[in-house]
């Protein structure tokens, strides 16, 4: 998502300076939008960038930042103007910049392989050249980037759900109870049938939304919101059902499903909660 917004909205100098190392995975980026007091209401952010002779002096903090304290570059949404969305800009903060610091590594339910921390700015000096696009257009860029991010999260959910389904299906054929494999009990058959159907429907819906976004269709954003909401909800349901099929074994680390359940749960919150997805969808359909 960070690479996309630099590629799409950054000038040539920013692209040449940062993109090569990002796309080669030599450098890691963090997308800094959420703040302690502004999650779903992202436009209420308070991190402020005051104009200086060199560029900007950044003050504030960002919360729940994936890669916080680990990343090489931070894409930061900050307020350079009034209190409306038009007063928000996007800047790039390089790791090691004076005034940049981090909170403790958060202890999370899932996503344990990825560091998450508060990112703090205390008179952090940013060169004017690190402004992405135009001043005051940052919120627009952030929302554009979130469309792609929502598809990414949905795709990750789908992959996790597919794996959980495969584990459960295989287990149901091997595990016997009352003299026969549990896969031959109608209750398990119905669960597996529903899981397979949900996976196929979610996959097709996700591909449709991705195609609309790639082709700049007018309903792309609402289709992305629909896909993110549906796929992440369905994927968590599938993984949770898979755990139930394994019974007590599903609760053990050894079988891998408990990790999928823990990891997929946050996908219903990331990149805009699924409640916010419903708000986006409702506003679109009611405006027709």
Where are these regions (language model features)?
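Helix-loop "lid/cap" segments that line or gate small-molecule binding pockets
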Residues: 1-9
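Alpha-helical interface subdomain recognition
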Residues: 9-14, 21-26, 39-42, 51-56, ...
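A short, Trp-centered hydrophobic/proline-enriched beta-strand micro-motif
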Residues: 25-33
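Conserved hydrophobic/aromatic beta-strand scaffold that supports enzyme active sites
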Residues: 30, 46-48, 73-77, 90-92, ...
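Short Gly/Pro-enriched turn/cap motifs at secondary-structure boundaries
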Residues: 37-40, 64-67, 79-82, 108-115
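Flexible, small-/acidic-enriched active-site or ligand-binding loops
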Residues: 44, 98-127
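A short core secondary-structure module
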Residues: 55, 59-102
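Long, acidic (Asp/Glu-rich), low-complexity accessory segments flanking structured domains
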Residues: 122-140
């Amino acid at each position: 998502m960070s690479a996309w917004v630099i590629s799409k909205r950054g000038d040539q100098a920013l692209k040449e300076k940062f993109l090569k190392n990002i796309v080669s995975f030599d450098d890691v980026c963090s997308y800094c939008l959420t703040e302690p007091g502004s999650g779903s209401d992202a436009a209420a952010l308070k991190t402020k960038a005051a104009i200086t002779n060199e560029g900007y002096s950044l003050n504030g903090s960002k919360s729940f930042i994936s890669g916080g304290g680990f990343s090489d570059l931070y894409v930061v949404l900050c307020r350079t103007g009034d209190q409306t969305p038009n007063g928000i800009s996007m800047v790039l903060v390089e790791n090691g910049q004076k005034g940049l610091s981090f909170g403790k590594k958060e202890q999370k339910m899932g996503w344990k392989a990825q560091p998450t921390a508060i990112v703090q700015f205390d008179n952090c000096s940013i060169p004017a050249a690190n402004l992405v696009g135009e001043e005051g257009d940052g919120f627009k860029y952030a929302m554009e980037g979130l469309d792609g991010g929502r598809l990414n999260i949905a795709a990750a959910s789908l992959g996790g759900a597919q794996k959980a389904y495969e584990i459960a299906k295989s287990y149901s054929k091997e595990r016997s109870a009352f003299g026969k494999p549990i896969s031959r009990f109608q209750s398990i058959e119905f669960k597996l049938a529903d899981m397979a159907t949900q996976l196929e429907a979610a996959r097709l819906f996700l591909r449709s939304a991705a195609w609309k976004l790639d082709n700049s269709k007018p309903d792309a954003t609402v289709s992305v919101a629909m896909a993110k909401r549906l796929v992440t909800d369905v994927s968590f349901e599938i993984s949770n059902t898979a755990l139930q099929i394994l019974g007590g074994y599903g609760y053990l680390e050894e079988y891998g499903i408990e990790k999928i359940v823990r990891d997929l749960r946050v996908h219903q919150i990331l990149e805009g909660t699924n409640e916010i997805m419903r708000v986006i969808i409702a506003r679109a359909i009611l405006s027709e």
